[in-house]
């Protein structure tokens, strides 16, 4: 099941209870979507099954998201070994664009401030998902594509290019030449290899 359109019976910041075809659904949500009782809404769903080893029970929970991108990020997060659904939900309490930017720019310090995420988990999130979300940052920075091509032509590998894109800060108000940006990127890559 990808999404569900249902009538809201109860809603708060953690749970939505909805009815569809005379069946009640309890859906865990990351934040208060301000859903109105007795109104219809659509949530993108993910069913998570966990096994209770000592009781041989399978427990299924439904997680719901307002946007498909939130659902995709949730799936990406729980694919990481030390991140479970509760931690992923805590991460998604923040604005999705803020989280994607943090992953793309490897802002481990910010991610580590989120409840349930320690420094090690934040590093894992950045290391395993950075490649997926680096392009989102590139779309916001028009110079990033030119920088990527320039560094690739100079023989730098993909990891160095991704690192440079996340580290180079450009004031878009000023008219800066791409060669200056490439120069800054090369300095950042050099500093990285010195450490």
From Swiss-Prot:
Xref: InterPro entries: RuvA (IPR000085), RuvA_2-like (IPR010994), RuvA_C (IPR011114)
Where does this protein chiefly localize? Answer: cytoplasm
Q: Does the keyword Amino-acid biosynthesis apply?
A: no
Q: What would you give as a GO molecular function for this chain, any one?
A: ATP binding
The region called Domain II is annotated at: 67-141
Entry keyword DNA damage = yes
Q: Which portions of the sequence form the region Domain I?
A: 1-66
Which biological processes are named by the entry's GO terms? DNA recombination; DNA repair
Q: Which controlled-vocabulary keywords does the entry list?
A: Cytoplasm, DNA damage, DNA recombination, DNA repair, DNA-binding
Lineage, top-rank taxon, reads Bacteria
For region Domain III, the annotated ranges are 141-195
**Annotated spans, Flexible linker:** 141
Protein's cellular compartments: Cytoplasm
GO CC, sorted alphabetically, is:
cytoplasm; Holliday junction helicase complex; Holliday junction resolvase complex
The written remark on domains in the entry is: Has three domains with a flexible linker between the domains II and III and assumes an 'L' shape. Domain III is highly mobile and contacts RuvB.
Q: How does it assemble?
A: Homotetramer. Forms an RuvA(8)-RuvB(12)-Holliday junction (HJ) complex. HJ DNA is sandwiched between 2 RuvA tetramers; dsDNA enters through RuvA and exits via RuvB. An RuvB hexamer assembles on each DNA strand where it exits the tetramer. Each RuvB hexamer is contacted by two RuvA subunits (via domain III) on 2 adjacent RuvB subunits; this complex drives branch migration. In the full resolvosome a probable DNA-RuvA(4)-RuvB(12)-RuvC(2) complex forms which resolves the HJ.
NCBIfam families noted in UniProt: ruvA (TIGR00084)
- Protein function: The RuvA-RuvB-RuvC complex processes Holliday junction (HJ) DNA during genetic recombination and DNA repair, while the RuvA-RuvB complex plays an important role in the rescue of blocked DNA replication forks via replication fork reversal (RFR). RuvA specifically binds to HJ cruciform DNA, conferring on it an open structure. The RuvB hexamer acts as an ATP-dependent pump, pulling dsDNA into and through the RuvAB complex. HJ branch migration allows RuvC to scan DNA until it finds its consensus sequence, where it cleaves and resolves the cruciform DNA.
What family does the database annotate? Answer: Belongs to the RuvA family.
Q: What is this protein called?
A: Holliday junction branch migration complex subunit RuvA
